[in-house]
Amino acid sequence: MSQQAETTDIKKKILSTGIRVGTQVKTKFMRPFITKASPEGLYMLDLDITLDKIKTAAKFINRLGVENLIVCSGRQYAETPIEKFCETLGSKKLLGRFMPGTLTNPSLPYYIEPKLVLISDPQVDEQAITEATNAGIPVIGIANTDNITSNLDVIIPANNRGRKALATVYWLLVRQILIEKGELKEEDPMNIEIDDFETKITEEEIE
């Protein structure tokens, strides 16, 4: 299967996940990644750019080493995707509230020195971005149409609110990282599916 055909298959697989569905707001930072507005007034992201940026992020992560990456988010729906990502690749996860000084205060017991940070939402994960920037650590961020991305080194334009969309972004990242590492061929399926990355909601939470 050619790379173009494989890309087409991937696009078909992920279109229904809402990965390209943005919000009713667009910032000047995200304008280059937006293709149009839906009839409902939601700005739509360019899926080709998203896939290209995922490849860029995967190359960046592999160059610095998955073991030197921390993946963090205060967003609930990002927890399972991050856990699966880190379980598969061996990166470190930081979920929930990002404790001040984590990247900037060596005297704290939870201080760490990663070479790269991956965040799920520039607004929710602002503390992590600020500390990484102050410490000179590059940041990869998943950003929606309404996000400010001035302190991100690599922007992955995608829906960072939806459960399935977030699962898809992290699944795509794992897949591309494994391809870059030579552990998976472009045409081969992964043994983990998007559903494995998705945060599940219980009946109690729905009620």
From Swiss-Prot:
Keywords: Ribonucleoprotein, Ribosomal protein. This is Small ribosomal subunit protein uS2. Belongs to the universal ribosomal protein uS2 family. GO terms for molecular function: structural constituent of ribosome. HAMAP family: Ribosomal_uS2_A (MF_00291_A). GO terms for biological process: ribosomal small subunit assembly; translation. GO terms for cellular component: cytosolic small ribosomal subunit. PROSITE patterns: RIBOSOMAL_S2_2 (PS00963).
